[in-house]
């Protein structure tokens, strides 16, 4: 076939025949009148940087095959397979032959496939699988790396180090599994502390710096067994976590590998072999340039473009399209949060179930022990012929505890609510009946009152009725406008005068001092949590560092602490630093460092040669009176004692003036009291009634007790010290301030009361005058009706005199105040 006018006359069809027609048309279109019909039919793809293009030289044009030039167009055949699989060698060859050389080659090609008709005779020898029925319905899905043990693998270099260096002269040897566990722990710790170690491998941390991170428990990977054992309380001592002395074996989980079953705990391995193994591992880490010593499989990470990297395994075949909306992300994140919450809830429930079963097991074991003890007691009682008192040896039936479930609790709440509703309905019905009875009685009363009013209204005149209505309206309005009666001694709101009990000044100062101490303790505890066992606070130890202190005899006023930030009243002459205090006390310490008051290290020739006068601190022994070490007495004395948990404390006893017994005996005669108590030889003397014992204890208390500390007043006496006045003056000033405030508020209340009283008297006068005028008008109208005078006559009304009204009000106010006084 040939193309006419460069137009494409063939149609797109499926099959090798149509492919041959299309290829022939393409060839004829190229060889025809010069029109490129293939270019109009085929869409050229964009040239990619990753695609390899073949370069043809001018000398190679005459030797090129036309089929090779049109290779891209010849492959445009509907194969029915995916685009990525069209490049397969056998399929590619078949497509070329089917499209171009089908009429020349009668032999058909096919894609080779393995012959699956035959069976392998040695299959049972290598694949002997047996189905084992599972014991639980809970399944888990984890990777092989999570269940096959530690990821580190021992090689020849590690084996040589383990045999020739580490285990050469040691009795308790480190096996290969424990060595791999240590190296894996090192790898995990370095990943956490130094994630960018490949930038500079020489800066790898030392063993002492990595040790706190190694001792932390990794609950998500290797120490899940220890966590479960601690939470269930099955293993109290982590050193016996893998011991099977109980007969029950170690506490294992599904995630534990069989290779790590007999491995000792990581803290024990770190203490015994950690330093030597870490030095060997760090050398290999530096040789690997900070990367992993054993290369791991490189997987495809989401969000990273690693399409060119040939070492990425298990690459996904589909294209990752960019996500343009955030709605799906929000929904997925919410689902993940809900899933995480449910998983945590399931974990807590499983741990609680494990704890419950552990407690039940412990109860059963205790019952068995009690039974054995009872049997032993019964045998002993039979041997000794002891009868009776056998109730303790009988196992009484225990009452089954009532378990309050959620359903029972809900039923009880519903019953209570129904009872409340029934009671309320009964009360409402009774109230409705009472209201109906009251309404009936009120209606009858109203009818009687209305009849009486009709009779009285007929007797009275219409004009008098209008006047009385106006007066009653004005009176009601005046009563509504009148405020509530006030009194001088009425209790005002708490916002103006606080209704509180004034506390003692000493109590307030003590509370302030307690709050300051509590604040300091909370800050120290918070700082300890922030350090996270990575830093050690040496200031908590009274022995290390040791200071040679001298106290100031007096404190000047400008340098005295007037706030919570107190300046130091101690002057440090020399300070000492040593690693081990016991070696120093035994006299064998050699690494003692001495610093002067400026913080500079003293390295004189005398000290370098071992001058003990500079390096040695004096130790005072109060029981060794024969050999005194001091020419003068220390301002403070120390006492060493052991407290709870075998914690050593160093107490400080301040030097105070001893209270003389003679001064105390000036007030109390001890001999007379002792003679008086010795006279009562007939009866035993109670300790609480002994006056001699009471006064002797009081004397001992006065010897060592003092209301002040060793440096003067308490820090809580700050208000008086800030104002440069005494504490008594500060108390008087505070009381005067409260008195003036209360006096001002009392004065305001008195003025307000007088104003209300004057306005009330004025209103009463006005109402009385209005009533008098109304009565005069009524009398005048009655006289007119009796005499038969015309209705248009007017009655003279006396106007209200304001001046007289003011005088009357003033006189009433004076009389009222005199009565109050």
UniProtKB/Swiss-Prot annotation:
Biased composition (Low complexity): 18-39, 449-465
A single BP term in Gene Ontology: DNA repair
Primary location group: nucleus
GO cellular component terms given for this protein: NuA4 histone acetyltransferase complex; nucleosome; nucleus; piccolo histone acetyltransferase complex
Subunit structure: Component of the NuA4 histone acetyltransferase complex.
Family statement: Belongs to the enhancer of polycomb family.
PANTHER family, per the entry: ENHANCER OF POLYCOMB
The name this protein goes by in its record: Enhancer of polycomb-like protein 1
Source organism of the structure: Candida glabrata (strain ATCC 2001 / BCRC 20586 / JCM 3761 / NBRC 0622 / NRRL Y-65 / CBS 138)
Gene field: EPL1
């Amino acid at each position: 076939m040939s193309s006419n006018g460069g137009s494409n006359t063939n149609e797109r069809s499926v099959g090798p025949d149509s492919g041959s027609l299309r290829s022939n048309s393409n060839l004829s279109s190229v060889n025809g009148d010069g029109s490129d019909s293939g270019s109009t039919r085929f869409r050229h793809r964009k040239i990619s940087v990753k695609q390899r293009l073949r370069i043809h030289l001018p000398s190679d044009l005459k030797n090129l095959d036309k089929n090779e030039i049109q290779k891209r167009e010849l492959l445009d055949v509907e194969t029915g397979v995916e685009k990525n699989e069209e490049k397969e060698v056998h399929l590619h060859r078949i497509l070329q032959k089917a499209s171009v050389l089908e009429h020349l080659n009668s032999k058909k090609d096919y894609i080779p496939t393995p012959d699956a008709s035959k069976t392998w005779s040695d299959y049972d020898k290598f694949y002997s699988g047996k189905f084992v029925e599972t014991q639980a319905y809970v399944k888990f899905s984890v990777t092989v790396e999570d269940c096959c043990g530690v990821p580190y693998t021992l090689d020849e270099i590690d084996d040589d180090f383990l045999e020739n260096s580490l285990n050469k002269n040691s009795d308790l040897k480190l096996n290969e599994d424990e060595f791999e566990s240590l190296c894996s722990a090192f790898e995990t710790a370095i990943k956490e502390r130094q994630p960018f170690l490949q930038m500079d491998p020489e800066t790898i941390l030392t063993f002492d710096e990595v040790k706190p991170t190694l001792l932390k428990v990794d609950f998500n990977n290797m120490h899940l067994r220890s966590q479960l054992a601690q939470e269930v309380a099955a293993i109290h001592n982590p050193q016996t976590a893998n011991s099977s002395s109980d007969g029950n074996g170690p506490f294992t989980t599904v995630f534990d590998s069989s290779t790590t079953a007999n491995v000792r705990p990581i803290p024990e391995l770190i203490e015994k072999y950690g330093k030597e193994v870490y030095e060997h591992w760090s050398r290999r880490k530096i040789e690997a340039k900070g990367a992993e010593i054993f290369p791991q499989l490189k997987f495809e990470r989401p969000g990273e473009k690693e399409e060119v990297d040939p070492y990425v395994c298990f690459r996904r075949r589909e294209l990752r399209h960019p996500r343009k909306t955030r709605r799906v992300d929000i929904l997925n994140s919410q689902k993940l949060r809900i899933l995480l919450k449910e998983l945590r809830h399931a974990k807590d429930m499983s741990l609680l179930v494990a704890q419950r079963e552990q407690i039940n097991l412990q109860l059963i074991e205790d019952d068995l022990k009690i039974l054995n003890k009872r049997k032993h007691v019964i045998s002993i009682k039979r041997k000794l012929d002891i009868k009776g008192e056998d109730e303790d040896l009988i196992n009484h039936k225990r009452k089954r505890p009532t378990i309050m479930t959620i359903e029972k609790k809900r039923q009880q709440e519903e019953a209570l609510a129904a009872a409340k509703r029934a009671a309320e309905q009964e009360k409402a019905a009774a109230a409705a009946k009472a209201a109906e009875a009251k309404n009936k009685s009120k209606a009858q009363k109203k009818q009687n009152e209305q009849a009486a009013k009709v009779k009285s209204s007929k007797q009275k005149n219409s004009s008098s009725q209008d006047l009385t209505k106006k007066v009653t309206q004005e009176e009601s309005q005046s009563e509504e406008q009148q405020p509530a009666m006030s009194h001088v001694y009425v209790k005002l709101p708490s916002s103006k005068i606080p209704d509180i009990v004034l506390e003692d000044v000493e109590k307030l100062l003590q509370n302030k001092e307690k709050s300051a101490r509590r604040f300091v303790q909370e800050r120290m505890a918070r700082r300890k949590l922030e350090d996270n066992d990575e830093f050690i606070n040496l200031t908590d130890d009274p022995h290390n560092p040791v200071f040679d202190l001298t106290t100031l005899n007096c404190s000047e006023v400008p340098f005295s602490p007037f706030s919570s930030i107190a300046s130091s009243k101690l002057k440090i002459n020399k300070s000492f630093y040593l690693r081990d205090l016991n070696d120093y006390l035994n006299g064998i310490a050699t690494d003692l460092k001495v610093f002067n008051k400026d913080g500079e290290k003293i390295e004189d020739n005398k000290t370098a040669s071992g001058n003990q006068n500079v390096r040695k601190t004096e130790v005072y022994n109060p029981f060794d009176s024969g050999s005194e070490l001091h020419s003068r007495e220390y301002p403070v004395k120390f006492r060493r004692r052991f407290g709870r948990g075998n914690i050593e404390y160093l107490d400080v006893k301040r030097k105070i003036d001893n209270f003389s017994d003679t001064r105390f005996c000036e007030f109390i005669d001890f001999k007379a009291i002792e003679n008086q108590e010795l006279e009562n030889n007939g009866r035993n003397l109670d300790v609480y009634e002994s006056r001699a014992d009471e006064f002797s204890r009081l004397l001992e208390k006065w010897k060592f007790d003092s209301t002040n500390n060793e440096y003067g007043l308490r820090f809580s006496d700050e208000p008086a010290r800030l104002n440069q006045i005494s504490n008594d003056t500060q108390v008087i000033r505070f009381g005067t301030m409260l008195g003036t405030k209360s006096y001002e508020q009392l004065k305001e209340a008195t003025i307000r009361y007088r104003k209300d009283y004057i306005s009330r008297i004025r209103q009463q006068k006005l109402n009385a005058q209005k009533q008098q005028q109304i009565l005069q008008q009524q009398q005048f109208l009655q006289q007119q009706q009796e005499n038969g005078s015309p209705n248009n006559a007017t009655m003279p009304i006396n106007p209200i005199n304001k001046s007289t009204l003011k005088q009357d009000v003033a006189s009433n106010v004076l009389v009222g105040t005199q009565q109050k006084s």
